[in-house]
Amino acid sequence: MSVGRPAAAAPEPSKLTRYQNWHVIVGPMTDERSVKSEKSPDDVKIVFTPSGRQGNVPAGTTVLQAARTLGVDIDSVCGGRALCGRCQITPGSGEFAKHGITSGADSLGEVTAVETRYADKKGLVGGRRLSCQSLLCGDVVIDVPPESQVHNQLVRKAADDRQIEMDPIVRLCLVEVREPDMHEHSGDFRRLVEALEAQWPDRVTGAISCDLNILQSVQPVLRAGKWQVTVSLRDGHHIVGIWPGLKERIAGVAIDVGSTTMSAHMCDMVTGEVLASTGAMNPQIRFGEDLMSRVSYGIMNPGGDREMTAAVIEGLQTLISGAAEQAGLTNEDVLEIVLVGNPVMHHLLLGIDPVELGGAPFALAVDTSVEIRASELGIDVHPGGRVYVLPCIAGHVGADAAGVVLAEAPQKNDQYTLVVDVGTNAEIVVGNSQRMLAASSPTGPAFEGAQISSGQRAAPGAIERIRIDKDTLEPRFRVIGVDQWSDEEGFDEAVKATGITGICGSGIIEVLGEMYLAGIISMDGVVDGQQAEKSPRIEADGRTFCYHISENVTVTQNDVRAIQLAKAALYAGFRLLMDKMQIKAIDRVVLAGAFGTHIDPKYAMVLGMIPDCQLENVRAAGNSAGAGARMALLNRGARHEIEAVVRDIEKIETAIEPSFQDHFVKAMAIPHKSDPYAKLAAEVELPERILTAEDAPAIEGGRRRGGRRRTRAPISAGPDR
């Protein structure tokens, strides 16, 4: 498709094509532009505060594009499409002698029609502009307010304590090598191989080979070690490292590359001990917060895929170097890296353009496991270091889902198990030892706090727990970084350091669950305006109502709808797999991923995010994808196992299944329109079910519709919650 790109006009709102409920850009965006060290007559100088980053860019560049090029992480949920309003900035006014700049509102182009519409609808205070719409006309200082900065998210993905049988693919072998003899003409490498075969017969499994750098260093290393050396033998036949004398420790790294966060666990390849764990935001987030925004960025910006690949490789290098420093090692001690990630991350990691994943049939370039040199990816570790990437299952069910399956092993259990990795794109596996099915469900970023008016990532100041009194509708809550609840002594003083900044993803699940249990929202998701008689926290919000948790944190009707849409997509996904399996119930539920770790299973079930089952059979498994990566790092048999298992998993494409939409509509109700959630009701006191007379009521925008008959469906009341 040929796409025009205006050079000096604000980008028009992009036309959108819907693929499996994802929005994919096929309309115009701004040019790819680079920052220059020397300023030309057509360039402007831009300085960002508080980061202090600055550079020269061509006039007509948008502020957001300049920020991306300079590495300033301005929040942009929609990927620069003028849809979210998260990328607000303020142009500095006055003379900035330090930078040699006189900055003002006229340093940016005129306010666009898109900004005017946004300001009329949601407001732009204090001279703020949308950075994705603001064109640079002159030298300028740009202030990025805290709410527009990508928060320093808490990456809570610690390694679990599961026991892993050690059978690493790389092993250390100390060998004594015969010195050269004038009467026996043999090369040093041949004698090294002979010594290795003789002294380590249980570890040598084939004809020994080596990398070129080993041949180049074998003679000086043998002599430095006085004919005693340690070699690292990979897969029983390939020498990838050699050191003089005794080398006691080498390391490997298991890395889970998520679309939002990345986590790494550095392990001792001899003992299996976790030496260090590090985590960070995925630096690709500046190109778009959800996966399809990044695919779109690559489509609309020539070389955008390479730009995103470079960003994530740089992020991986930072993680590895940080973990090595924590462990008291160097990058050269790292000989093995195992990676897992969703299909888009998987492709970008390998330098593969993910454009084909942007539309049906969502074709993968490769679905088998991949094994390459670390140097081929530009990762700086030991010269013999290798990277192993777990296989993808299909389409939008990636290597991270394979890692979850490896760690949780539903294929080894006779019980029917649902494994779900909740994220921007939920990956779902249902099955047991007889059969397994997998699907992806486009839940969107609402579960991570995006699309929520007070939503944010899990950072200090974010509400993560809440309880609402059913009689007074008064909330009590906890925020990340503060030990006390809001009604406890010392909270007000402790929270001053961070403030109450918003609601994180796991927190919004609990907030809506409590609002439903307290009667603030009805079964069809409407914020009940009649409850305003009970509490001033419920106020009119245009034609709907909202609930105030604190002075600056509010839950609106649109927030409720965003979660309804996300949870309905999740329910429809696993229900579709249950239909294919011809089963009516799930025996156990495994919530994978860092987000799943922090969801209270009760509230996930109250909202209908997971199927009805005994609450004690719902388990938060933590970062199972990372655990699977660690298993593949420390046990080569685990690699063979998952490679075989994924071939037997049946992939169901939700986009072409007629029943998906029917399940989706019914799942919009809380917890569900037709499923009574009887097991949950036996443990949690649920509100009285009020059903409409129609089989499939329209649920739009939270507006009450006239002429709808409502019937009451009593439900057995359990003990007090």
Task: Place the predicted regions along the sequence by residue.
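Short glycine/threonine-rich loop-to-helix capping motif typified by GTGT followed
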Residues: 341-356, 583, 594-614, 654-663, ...
